Amino acid sequence: MTLFALAGTPLATPRACHLFYGFTHEREARPVFTGLVEALGTVEAMTPAGAGARLVLRESVLAPQLTLGESVCVNGACLTVVAHDAGTFAFEAGPETLARTDLGVLKPGDRVNLERSLRLSDRLGGHLVTGHVDGLGRIESRQTDGEWVTTWFQCPEELAAQLVGKGSVAVDGVSLTVVGVRRDGFSVMLIPHTLSVTTLGFKAVGAPVNLETDLLAKYVWKYLSLTNPSVPV
């Protein structure tokens, strides 16, 4: 399976790198991320907007570089920039996003993980993250071992079934390696760098997290559901 179609695409393109399956046109492309957080943003405002909400974030480094319509991964959810200035930028989240993620409970002062979409010239240091959150999990426990922290997350059984030890999972948009898996949860080992540059360094036990399983695991899961009716979709 071809993941990227590079033919005819300049390596120096702006941040509009997308996940391709074979040959595609630009209008069919989708943003993709790596799960490597670039910055922590601060919620400036969260206000109702029709059936959804308008989220305004403050972050002085990324804001001047953004363009209208650009995709940004916010705590693991792919959102589109609808306004920005030198220090703030805004997104609009629909009812599906609010129902499937923890964005709906954000309040002014909360911190969020931010990552711009991947460019063709970038290194894939984490794993392919689409920004389409599969569901919510919750921090169950944190155990410190020196500078490292082993963290267990509770999650829906259908998501845990898509995880394997040494596989990848995105938690609040952070690419992590799975250590242990059980029927309704999984564990990871958080290194000092991850603890210092992402929200996972200060989120407390009981806090919700956005989860996205590995893209290839989704296709395997879908195939199994078609061949075995007992596998939930």
Model regions: which residues?
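Extreme N-terminal basic, low-complexity initiation segments
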Residues: M1-A12
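Conserved loop->alpha-helix
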Residues: F20-V233
